[in-house]
Design a protein with these regions (language model features):
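Hydrophobic ligand-binding cavity/cleft-lining segments
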Residues: 1-42
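Hydrophobic/aromatic beta-strand elements that line small-molecule binding cavities or substrate pockets
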Residues: 11-13, 46-48, 70-76, 94-101
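A short, structured loop/turn motif at beta-sheet edges
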Residues: 19-20, 51, 75-80, 98-107
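Hydrophobic pocket/interface hotspot
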Residues: 22-26, 32, 56-58, 74, ...
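Glycine-rich portal/gate segments that line the openings of hydrophobic small-molecule binding cavities
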Residues: 44-86
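Beta-strand/loop substructures that line and gate deep hydrophobic ligand-binding cavities in soluble
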Residues: 84-133
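Short, highly charged C-terminal tails/helix-capping segments
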Residues: 140-149
Length: 149
């Protein structure tokens, strides 16, 4: 198998929040619907079984009105530490979000891993900015949750 570094988009962001506050935004389907996806996208979540092996079905609504059905399976969940899904339809990938406590908050480590280097390279120009936007939307949702608390 090809090295994971060559077939993954990896990035991280430091959020001024506890791992518990960040995980709350990742584990509540209503909150996930607000931050999931790149800028301009909205989401309808049809099923969100937040447990290892659980199904996650959603439709992402693009800014141009195009609907993108998505099917994923939660592969690993560790409260306040890890959220991992396998995306099953369309482009197959594994997405891992790790929460690392830091003095200034929580570092979110995001890694989207494709099956092959070729698959990743075909999508890299879209994936990189989309993942940056996704993390920015997660950060905004975490802050929104802190204000509401």
């Amino acid at each position: 198998m090809e090295p994971i570094e060559l077939r993954s988009d990896s990035r991280h962001v430091l959020l001024a929040a506890t791992p518990t506050e960040v995980f709350a935004a990742m584990s509540d389907p209503d909150r996930v619907a607000r931050w999931w996806g790149p800028d301009g996208f909205a989401n309808t979540i049809h099923q969100f079984e937040f447990k290892p092996g659980g199904r996650w079905l959603l439709t992402m609504h693009g800014p141009d009105g195009t609907d993108y059905p998505n099917e994923s399976r939660f592969t690993r969940i560790v409260d306040n530490q890890v959220f991992e899904i396998e995306h099953l339809n369309g482009h197959h990938f594994l997405l891992t979000l790790e929460l690392v406590p830091m003095d200034a908050g929580t570092q979110v480590r995001w890694r989207q891993t494709f099956d092959t280097v070729e698959h990743y390279r075909r999508l890299a120009e879209f994936v990189a900015p989309a993942n940056e936007q996704n993390l920015a939307r997660l950060a905004a949702e975490v802050q929104r949750g802190k204000r509401a608390a």
